[in-house]
Amino acid sequence: DLSSEKRSVCLINDSFPPVIDGVANAVTNYASIIQRNYGDATVVTPYYPDADDSIYPFPVLRYPSIDVTKLVGYRAGLPLSPELMAQVEGRHIDLIHSHCPVTSTILARMLRQRLHVPLVFTYHTKFDIDIANAIHSKRLQEASIKLLVENISACDEVWTVSRGAGENLRSLGYQGDYIVMPNGVEITA
């Protein structure tokens, strides 16, 4: 019976405590529930100085980052880390779940290729607004959105947190299928 089989899920996001935002909270909650009820969760996120990951009941693997908080409010992860790849490979991951369509999903795609496991992406927010706030050139905004949509389109399955988020994703040019999967919903068999 597959429903009772324990799974190992790798959750990847560009934000995680000490940064607090809605997506970081969702990832923390996903990881806690998976770890408590369904198997093993591993969170992969950029390095932040003074982060205390020992408080979590699941491992948090951090990879190198650069400080771009003045530009976008976050540290930008540098996902080309052989050490991180080896650490994740050692966790025997069954599923990768990315929550940010930029660095996290680039890393998730590299891990999927290496581990041969499915990649789910959740679209949480209107990234076109974030891009417009961070990049003032219209041409660069359009190129960034195109890359974002290509990154999302490369995932095996796409979830959105609401119908409105799905419509926003479509308005950016995404043409694939998506499943509305509201945060905070626990699926029981």
Could you say what each language-model-derived stretch is?
Residues 1-64, 89-91:
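N-terminal subdomain of nucleotide-sugar transferases
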Residues 95-123, 127-128:
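An aromatic- and histidine-rich active-site surface loop
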Residues 58-86, 98:
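A short, charged, and often flexible helix/loop element on the N-terminal side
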Residues 47, 164, 184:
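Carbohydrate-associated surface elements
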Residues 87-89, 150-151:
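Structural alpha-helical scaffold elements that stabilize or flank donor/cofactor-binding regions
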Residues 153-162, 179:
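A short beta-strand/loop micro-motif in the catalytic core of glycosyltransferases
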Residues 118-120, 128-150, 187:
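Nucleotide-sugar donor phosphate/pyrophosphate-binding loop at the beta->alpha transition
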Residues 114, 141-157, 172:
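Membrane-proximal helix-turn-helix segments that form the acceptor-binding/catalytic region
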